[in-house]
Amino acid sequence: IALLPNTHPVVQTKESVAYVTRPMPGHPVTVHAVAAVTVDARGKDLTEMMDLQRAGVVAFSDGHNSLQNSDMVLKVLQYLQPFGGLFINRPEDTLLIQFGTMNEGVPATMLGMKGMPRMAESMMVMRDLRLLEYTGGKIHFACLSTAEAVELVRQAKKRGLRVTCDVAAHQVVFTDQDLMQFDTHLK
């Protein structure tokens, strides 16, 4: 299991990596650390990625926080090159989805909820793929939720870019149509 740095404190030091990855006698699971790419996962200053990689992290990410600054993403991809580090980003334009509660569409309108446009994800995927083309390296997109973003990843793979992605389980099982019943289990 790879543990994202959505912890308090954030996994961003050699000591926190050692703590998270320590062997647990009697437990059949091995935990690998994904370290924060920026200090406190706030998107401002880079962590000591080379030291963290030497300490045993398997990837770098700000977890649920999308890295918004294009120049920062460029620097991350360049910095990870010498040791083949993997950058995991959750592609969301936070200004476009601000105050959004569900997918933008008919159900959101009917429920009177602010929707989050699909382009907020696909624009960030496009940006990061362009930066990946420029720098080389490898990137993983976490929690993709739109067909457009998946198609962009598919096309990038065909062009030879080292890109992977995942989808959250609830996004495979449920759609915005399910919210029309006001089922509180779907919050």
Where are these regions (language model features)?
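Metal-associated gating/positioning segment near the N- to mid-region
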Residues: 1-25
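Active-site neighborhood of phospho(di)ester-bond hydrolases with catalytic His/Asp-centered motifs
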Residues: 1-9, 32-35, 61, 90, ...
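Surface-exposed, flexible loop/turn segments at secondary-structure boundaries
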Residues: 8-9, 39, 95, 147
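Short acidic, glycine/proline-enriched helix-loop-strand junctions
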Residues: 12-16, 29-30, 80-85
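Short amphipathic alpha-helical surface micro-motifs
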Residues: 13-19, 41, 124, 147
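A glycine-rich helix N-cap at a beta->alpha junction
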Residues: 22-36
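Active-site beta->alpha loop and helix N-cap motifs at the rims of alpha/beta catalytic domains
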Residues: 36-42
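Histidine/acidic residue-rich metal-binding segments in metalloenzymes
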Residues: 44-187
